[in-house]
Amino acid sequence: NLKIIPSKKEIQKSIRSLSPEIKKAIDETYKRVKDWHVKQKPKDIFYKDKFNNKFYYKNKSIRSVACYVPGNLPSTLIMCATPAIIAGVKRIVVCTPSLNGKLNGAVYYAASILGIKECYSLGGASAIMALATGTPKVKPVDKIVGPGSKWVALAKKKVFLEGLCGIEAANMGPSEILCIADSSSDSEIIASSCIAQNEHSPDS
């Protein structure tokens, strides 16, 4: 059984199971996501009017954020954590459930290249509550981001409405997609696009 806080040995073992191709894909994904979000970072503003009044608008990051990552989606961690890194958040946490008692090496490899060292092997609504309120083993955070099941989405909404923790959205549950196609479309590509969403939840 895995502990709530995986050991370095367990994490390294999971990462060693990855092929060079997977690592390269994760590296490239991080580079592309980072390049985009760097351009989005708002700039501080200093202004002095003709009466010598000085105005200063400073962007300041929150202290901590947790990235909730469904068990097999390193892309989710990259997309959630990269903006926080660029914003200057000092404490970034990853919370991801194990799958059949095993760590997902791709998620933990993504965490390693992002420089995230605080990792929790937890999932579901209980993970959201632990991150929002804290436990003897899980330190609370200021904000929780990332998708999950409908139970995760409801838990995020609850901790937000009770003033326990910030969230980025309350409706990031199972995916809802629409494929627009006509007689010229490839039916296999359309079907695979829909089937790909089933990894999120049976009711996606």
Feature annotation, model-predicted:
Residues 2, 45, 53, 57-60, ...:
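Flexible, active-site-adjacent loop/turn segments at secondary-structure boundaries
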Residues 85, 112, 132:
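Short polybasic/polar patches that bind polyanions
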Residues 35, 104-115:
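N-terminal small/polar loop signature for handling phosphorylated ligands or for N-terminal nucleophile
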Residues 115-203:
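Conserved NAD(P)+-binding/catalytic subdomain of aldehyde/semialdehyde dehydrogenases
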